[in-house]
A protein has these predicted regions:
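Substrate-binding pocket helix/loop in short-chain dehydrogenase/reductase
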Residues: 4, 32-33, 40-42, 130
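A short, exposed helix-loop element centered on a Lys and neighboring polar residues
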Residues: 56-57, 103
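Alpha-helical segment proximal to the catalytic Tyr-Lys
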Residues: 61, 107-108, 158
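Catalytic loop of short-chain dehydrogenase/reductase
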Residues: 72-97, 102-103, 107-111, 123
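Short C-terminal tail/terminal secondary-structure segment
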Residues: 161-176
């Protein structure tokens, strides 16, 4: 919590009140859930769920006071479909928690001029991605995610809250 407070204090001293918040955090634990230490499990949960909660907890009061704000959380495309892999269980469970938190926060702030939504990619193109497995011959690009983010932050999405857009190239509906 102290690190989040320091971050917000720094941003607010340089830029003013936070009225747009994008929670893009993630920690993996690519190991079978039974083989994980409790400490690693908690670290993945803290990075994915707690950090999102703490940043929202810090940003929402000022957004409520301003009667305007935009929050976009980053989830995982498999969460809505119940995709779970025992070899990375804490990540899947944590990102599902982020989506549930998104919906709860959207309901709680709906009368305050704040929208809360989520973007959920499957795989974003990195050097670790395997293009031969990708739908449409490629994984999602950062530009694919930015397009959805820009929509959520635009006036066109003023009445959109509590939603999740999966950016998966149609891959997950085929696999679940």
């Amino acid at each position: 919590a102290e690190a989040v407070d320091r971050l917000f204090d720094s941003v607010e001293s340089e830029l003013g009140t936070v009225d747009v918040l994008v929670n893009n955090v993630g920690a993996f634990a690519p190991s079978h859930w039974e083989a994980l230490s409790v400490e690693r499990w908690r670290e993945v949960m803290a990075t994915n769920v707690d950090a999102t909660y703490l940043c929202c907890r810090r940003a929402v009061p000022a957004m409520r006071e301003a009667e305007w704000g935009r929050i976009v959380n980053v989830g995982y495309a498999g969460s809505e479909k119940g995709l779970v892999n025992p070899k990375n269980a804490p990540y899947f469970i944590a990102k599902t928690g982020v989506l549930l938190f998104t919906r709860m926060l959207a309901a709680d702030t709906t009368d305050d001029g704040i929208t809360v939504n989520a973007i959920s990619p499957y795989v974003v193109d990195t050097s670790d991605a395997f293009p031969e497995d990708a739908p449409r011959g490629r994984w999602a690009s950062v530009d694919d995610l930015v397009a959805v983010l820009e929509f959520f932050l635009s006036a066109a999405a003023e009445y959109v809250s509590g939603e999740n857009v999966e950016v998966d190239g149609g891959y997950l509906p085929e696999t679940v």
